[in-house]
Amino acid sequence: MWSQETVPDFIRTYAASRGAGSSVESGADSLLRSMDACGIDASVAVALIPEPNPKDDLVSEINDYVRMQVAGHSDRLAGFCAVNPRSPKAVDDLRRHLDTWAQGLKFHGAMQEMSVDSPSLYPIYEVMAAYGRPVLFHSGDIGVLPTKNRYTRAELFDAIACDFPSMPMILGHACRIEWSAVAGLLRKHRNVYAEISSVIGRDQATQARPLGNLLVAIKEWAGSLENVLFGSDAPLYSQADTQQNIDRLLDEPSLWESVLSADEILAVRDTNSGRFATAHNLFTTSH
């Protein structure tokens, strides 16, 4: 979630290149309208720092926007903050956000140009583990130029999960396209979750197949889809498009019926995220 003043040009260009269904329109009103249209009860709204060396004023503006947008909607919108790990104020800022409004942290290693397993991030992870709050990571590749993939490869998350087993880790985009690697992470670590936003193929004829391949790999290796969460990456990918992709997958049982049940896929769409939110009190806050 971002104000129009803080949307960088490269994200505007990416949204325009995707055509219908992709937008930079943001804010609580548009998100709640989408949720109502899709039958979604609650959503996470994240602050996004899109550059490696932002000025303090920009970081404050990005977080303040999300804080103000989710205010008054705590039953439906949970705000995740963002920090600049290169700033000497990062840990203090993080504690302040968690103490006053944020339910979690968003870290985008590709845009912030820092490997997710960097020692510079460990003081931040220590705070998140102490609070028991989730970190939502960008994981896997990124289709947005000029950002680079190397900071968020799937294998980098193993060390974090080993060193911070009490910190809930949500791997945004499910380490796209490293399905076997993310399946291995979910097999090994109980605190790791895979989120399915933008797991949508570009070939319309096989659009749902990547999601099917991901879910089959996780079921075969981790034994369950319970740690697979619904997410959309709205407004760049709409909530409706993500729901429709799951519906397409359900309509193609040949892709999954030897391994999965329809109920397991429906749980990814309808119930797993709610169970995660309840377990971590995302929408019951005293802030």
Tell where the protein language model's regions lie, with residue ranges:
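Generic structural signal for well-ordered alpha-helices
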Residues: 28-32, 63-70, 94-95, 121, ...
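Active-site gating/metal-coordination segments in enzymes
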Residues: 41-151
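Catalytic pocket-lining loop regions of alpha/beta-barrel enzymes
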Residues: 103-104, 117-229, 257
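Mid-to-C-terminal alpha-helical segments outside catalytic/metal-binding sites
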Residues: 1-42, 223-227, 238-287
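A generic "structured core" feature
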Residues: 1, 93, 97, 160-163, ...
